[in-house]
């Protein structure tokens, strides 16, 4: 593995030095190296759905706005904006110093200033049914958008939606060049031209992706120095997590994001701390992650025992989440003993949810048996292999209270399809926020969002919940909206269409010479201010 990695490293050096004669002197020590476990499917922001795509696209593109590490919406290409009193019209004033990455397709100047017309084109493209972008839903509440002037872009919503700016921070809404799209056609996925801190250099699919510093990037640090600091980003595609871990420990990768069962006990303790033997080599950082891991219960199955709330509550009380996190996740994650909304959001509901109460679980199970006459109740949990250990833990715990559990392990693709079609009575799932607002989580339980046309995988339906949800999406005042969110969250806990497992945490390992990497609740990899100590 070391020889293979060194060969690619030498290739990287050769390509960068030989092809960049017109650019500033290249410093190979400022190359940031990380690994993805599978190939990136596209470098087109219209297809920035999976994290591996999003991370690469984030280095290449900008949108109107962005999120800081505290999830506040801050300017990007839009330097300022105004929102109408009714909350429907957003008017953005654009910077006049943002240029597309240099390319001969732009003619003699090799680049072009970004204008409001580019955003108009980019948004139309996102909605184009021929493109089939998975991000078209972001603009489903948009009535119209237009370039009022070169430096002014306006969006009108069908109805007010306070989290809308957070939606615009998604990578789907990045600006692209019409000339580049028309020039490359279907090959644009592998020939991206954006405005971001890094520009495309080389992509050997399934092997390596290389991005180079954009010398014309518009953002500066607080001292006025141009960003980014790094010279390049090099991404490898080693599928084996154990191999990635070895490459990281040997210093051939600067950063590692995953924690796999094959090495988790070697690198961190059961309390979630870095093992002493690595403290002089590695920096570890953890933080809240907008991801709730849970078991979903499909409520439209006729004659299934999980339609009965007594069973769903018995499951929720019947296993020890704290023990599960400590021994199976080495303390990485927070037991989901409150609501469904994760702890990284300001509207997190500090209500008393489900804690381990085996006696209460047994009591609820006996009530179910007496009520239904079913003497030996049993359930099936469907999962993929990545979460088998968690499901087996729950299986053992529930069998101790008298509930028989079968685990069905299937491929991830089959699990996704089965969830969407109501095939499974209980399924393991997770919900990672697309934007930093609890509406993102509560939309999973709105009755008009039933799958396959929406994210309501459980087919939960509650008149009071729906009324609160419809009211909340137009409330501009954050505190008032958060109170409505918490009421909805309380209904979810009481009715138990889901079994919350834990609120996830971001975990990042980096080499000791990596500075200012940072961490955030949406687990975005932001490399603009990262640098490497020599």
Task: Report the location of each language-model feature.
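Ligand-site clamp/hinge motif
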Residues: 186-189, 217-270, 404-406
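Ligand/substrate-recognition segments at binding pockets and active sites
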Residues: 257, 334, 366-433, 506
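Alpha-helical secondary-structure segments
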Residues: 115-120, 196-197, 227-232, 250, ...
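Structural transition elements
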Residues: 198, 334-368, 387-389
């Amino acid at each position: 593995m070391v020889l293979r990695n060194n060969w690619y490293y030498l290739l990287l050096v050769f390509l960068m030095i030989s092809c960049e004669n017109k650019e500033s002197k290249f410093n190979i020590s400022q190359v940031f190296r990380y690994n993805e476990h599978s190939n990136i499917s596209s470098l087109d922001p219209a297809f920035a759905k999976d994290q591996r795509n999003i991370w690469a696209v984030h280095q290449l593109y900008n949108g109107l706005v962005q999120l800081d590490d505290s999830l506040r919406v801050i300017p990007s290409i839009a330097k300022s904006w105004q929102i109408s009193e009714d909350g429907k019209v957003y008017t953005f004033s654009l910077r006049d110093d943002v240029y597309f990455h240099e390319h001969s397709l732009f003619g003699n100047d090799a680049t072009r200033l970004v204008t409001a017309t580019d955003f108009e084109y980019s948004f139309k493209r996102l909605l184009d049914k021929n493109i089939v972008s998975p991000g078209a839903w972001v603009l489903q509440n948009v009535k119209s958008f237009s370039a009022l002037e070169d430096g002014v872009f306006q969006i009108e919503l069908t109805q007010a939606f306070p989290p809308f700016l957070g939606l615009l921070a998604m990578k789907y809404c990045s600006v692209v060049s019409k000339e580049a799209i028309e020039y490359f056609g279907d090959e644009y996925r592998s020939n991206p031209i954006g405005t971001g801190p890094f520009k495309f250099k080389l992509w050997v699919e399934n092997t390596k992706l290389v991005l180079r510093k954009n010398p014309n990037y518009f953002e500066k640090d607080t001292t006025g120095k141009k960003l980014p600091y790094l010279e390049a980003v090099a991404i490898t595609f080693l599928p084996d997590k154990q191999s990635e871990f070895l490459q990281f420990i040997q210093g051939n990768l600067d950063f590692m994001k995953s924690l796999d069962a094959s090495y988790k006990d070697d690198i961190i303790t059961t309390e979630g701390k870095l093992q002493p033997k690595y403290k002089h080599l590695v920096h570890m950082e953890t933080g809240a992650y907008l991801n709730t891991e849970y078991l979903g219960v499909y409520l439209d199955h006729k004659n299934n025992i999980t339609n009965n709330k007594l069973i769903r509550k018995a499951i929720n009380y019947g296993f020890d989440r704290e023990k599960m996190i400590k021994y199976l996740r080495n303390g990485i994650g927070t037991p989901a003993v409150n609501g469904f909304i994760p702890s990284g959001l300001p509207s997190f509901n500090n209500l008393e949810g489900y804690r381990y109460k085996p006696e209460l679980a047994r009591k609820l199970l006996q009530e179910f048996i007496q009520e239904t006459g079913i003497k030996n109740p049993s359930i099936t949990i469907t999962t993929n292999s990545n979460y088998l250990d968690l499901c087996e833990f729950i299986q053992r715990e529930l069998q101790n209270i008298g509930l028989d559990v079968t685990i069905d392990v299937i491929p991830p693709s089959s699990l996704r399809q089965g969830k969407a079609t109501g095939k499974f009575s209980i399924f393991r799932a997770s919900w990672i926020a697309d934007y930093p607002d609890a509406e993102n989580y509560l939309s999973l339980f709105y009755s008009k969002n039933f799958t396959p046309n929406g994210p309501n995988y459980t087919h939960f339906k509650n008149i009071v919940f729906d009324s609160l949800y419809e009211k909340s999406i137009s409330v501009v005042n954050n505190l008032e909206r958060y109170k409505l969110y918490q009421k909805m969250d309380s209904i979810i806990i009481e009715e138990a269409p889901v079994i919350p497992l834990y609120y996830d945490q971001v975990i990042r390992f980096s080499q000791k010479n990596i500075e200012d990497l940072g961490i955030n609740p949406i687990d975005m990899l932001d490399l603009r201010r990262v640098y490497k100590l020599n």
